[in-house]
Amino acid sequence: MKKKLKSVLIWFLIFTFNLSLGSFREVFADNNDAVLATAITLSKNEDKLLVNQTDTLTAVVTPDNASNKGVTWSSSDTNTAAVDQNGKITALKVGTVTITAATQDGSNLSSSCTVSITRLANSIVLNKMVDKLPVGQTDLLTALVRPLDSAVKDVTWTTSDPSVVSVDDKGNIKALKLGMAVVTAAVNDGRNLHASCNVYVTNLLSKRKKADLVVTLDNSMNIDKTTFKDKLNKYIESKLKGSNIDYTIQSIQGYKSKKVLIIQDQPAWESGTKVYDDIKQEGYTSDVITANQISSTELTQYSHIYIPSDQAQSFYDELNQNYSKLEAWTKGGGILIFNAADEGHHSGQWQGSFLGLTHTPSDFQPTITIVKQDPILTANLKTTITGNYAAHSQFTSYPSNSIIFAVGNKNLPTILEYRYGDGLVFAQTTTAEFYATNSGDLSPYLDNEIKYTIQKTLGRSFSDILKKPTWRENSEKFVINLGDTLANDVKENSMAQTLAELESNKAYVTLIGNNNNKDTLNSFINKNDGRGMFIDNSDLDGALSKAGDYIMTVLNKEEQNSNMFLTDDYINYNESSSEDVSWSYTQDCKHLNYDNDFVNCSKTGDIALDNDLGISDFANGQWVNNEINEFKKPGKYTIAYKFKDNAIVNETVNVNRKPTPIFTAYTAQDAVSGKYDVVIKDEDKSYDIDHENSDGDRKGIVNSKFQWKEVTQGVNDTWHDGKLPSGQDSNKDFIVKLEVQDLEGQWSNPLVKYITTRNSNVAPHAQFTESAEEMPVDQLNNDASVGMDAIFTDESYDANGDSIREHWIVTDNNGNTIYDSTSMPKASVFVGKPLGTYNVTLTCDDGPTPKVGAMLTSDSYTLQLKLVPINHKPVAKFEVDNTSKVPADIKITEDSTDPDGDKITEKDWTVTDDKGKVVLQTENKLPDLSNLNGSYTITLKVKDSPVGLPELWSDPLSKTIIVEGAK
């Protein structure tokens, strides 16, 4: 029994142990067998939403058998975006927010998504809704997408007509041809949100650039003018032509410091040094060589060659052998004086032809006759000159352009001159050298001849050249000098006057010289306000190329004004359309009032013009097929053009004239202090010709500016504002300038005057301006253009303050004098004169009693005035035989005329009914009346085609007819 009980107890204990072990296992399973999350991943790490949009994120917890996959959602900024516990995000406002999902099983894992919240654009705005560009110009359009925090800011640019206006992806537009295109910017969000700009491609006008060149060639360059012209064309003119520059070369002046070459084997007629001495007396130096030295002598260093008469036969033989060299030198711009009397004391005889001349040997002339007087050449000579063989021959052949001064007994020339290429030949067969040292009728002649031929020189010193160029109004002015002589010229005190001339014209000086003279020449350029450039002349081709580049650099800096022009401007139309364009012009004799800040004027609207020149013939509102490039009469012009039969745009421009500055300036020495007082006055006489009468005491001038600087040799000064003050020391040179501004804002050319405190007389300065380079003349009415009474403004002055006397001469193209007076010529001088160019010359002196020293005379100052015709309207004329009302029997006879004799090129017929409605229009053919019935008005206009002038339409002519035709 006990054994059985023991066995039961054992089994009970085993059962209890197993039961306890099972409970332990359950507890262990509860605490050690749960699966934790190892990672959490969101469906997005970045998200973009618009305001009020929603999106749902999902969170994946791994591993798949994780005991607890629950997550908790949160937002870093609940004001920007909210998130619920299902991961649904709601965008509340623009911004950036972080949405986070975190595990719930205690594993402390999380994952985040960055959400950027934006909003849709609601508008797009361009910087321009309308743009107007001339052909070839560019502009930038910019697009502003609103609101600024919009989701999409990129835009796409398009153009409605890429042949008219192009546009790139950045909004850069370019005008290609006349017309209009719509340029559109669209937001790239697929909603067709866009904005547009209407771009009109117009004919915005611009001034054609003008350049005037004065070129001086120093003979030290050892180059003849013909070769130099070729280089000038290659390196300078070609660049001007290629850029469509309106240019002139005023002159190509070859010069040297007064040096003559005498070629002789011995003095003529035992005259000793007479020829040499006479040349020296004229301020020239001479070199003397024999004929056999011609081949080894560089001729280009001389301005003149003098060949005396009476040489041995070997001399003339040698002369013939060097003929080609002498001919090339003369054609290149030299002056050759050939005293051709042979068979004298030395028995030589020249034969054949020499520079276009032949003569009859041994044709001795005891008498010669003066047939053309000259104040220098024939001074103190009798009309009929006799002597022992006054001439040793006559010229039997000579160039047709010769000017003959004297003839022999066969009425053949014995004294003549003629142009030969770019040079000049003066030849004569008198025994001048003999009578220069012996008595007789010819005694004065050699002195006269040398003085005449030396002063006749084709070249002048650099200083003289700069004093006399004729510049065109509104051009850029350039002086180009090549050579090494100038370095000495610019050291002279007279250069103060030259600087005044350069400043008056704002001229640029390009000095091509030896590097040894660089500092001197650069100093001169600096005195010219730096307007210029020094170039080393060791490589002439390279130097001229640099000069051309410099000129183009200056011209390319010139400012262009789109709506303000001067009467002398040439106007470019910047269009390149292949389509037909018609033009129409109207004009008012007034100017636009721009209400500029500097215009202290109470007037409103447009300002009427004083001294207007009337309405331009072409400004009649008629449509024409050619554009007008020159507006010779001031006023406000409206320019319209039709493109594909539609009026595209009107351009309104002002055409005016520059104001004119006036002042008087001189110095006077104080007797006590010895200092010099400076008197500057009369600036209130300055005026603007467009407003001088209607603007009270101002005379159209709203601003004025005085400046001065010292230009004494060795002094480098800059401009000082205001008038030159008194109390100046002696022996100083100054230039003073005045500029004035008119109501339109146009500044005048500077009026510059030279003032000196030197106790010596200075020659007065002759100078005047002209209101226009051309004067229209109505030849039908034998009258000048309206408003052209005063065409010149006198600007002459004397640096010492002396009173001046004036001498005015007007000559025609043939050298005939049409006016000679001490008074300035007016327009009436030119009434009834032939069309063409006239030279107006002024010379002054300070006589009879200047303050210091003897009376001095100014250099002559010359401007050219061109008389041009006025085109008159053609006259429309036709007759109608309306005896019959049947269309086929109505006869129309047209017989229009033009008062100037110009060809009529267009005839426009218009037929209107009794209500004014146009029913027929034809061009250059009679209207067909066959389909008409009733009362009609026939109107004819005709257009002329003058040469070199704008074409004009006639006034319309109308006639009424009755037609009984189709019903």
Swiss-Prot record:
Which InterPro entries does the UniProt entry name for this protein? Big_2, Class_I_gatase-like, Ig-like_fold, Invasin/intimin_cell_adhesion
UniProt keyword terms in alphabetical order: Plasmid, Signal
Q: What is this protein called?
A: Uncharacterized protein CA_P0160
- Indicate yes or no for the key word Signal: yes
Question: Looking at the record's lineage, which domain of life comes first?
Answer: Bacteria
- Entry's SUPFAM superfamilies? Class I glutamine amidotransferase-like, Invasin/intimin cell-adhesion fragments
User: A Pfam family this protein belongs to?
Assistant: Big_2
* Residues annotated as signal peptide: 1-29
**Regions that span the bilayer:** none
- According to the entry, every stretch annotated as the BIG2 domain falls at 38-107, 133-190
Keyword presence, RNA-binding: no
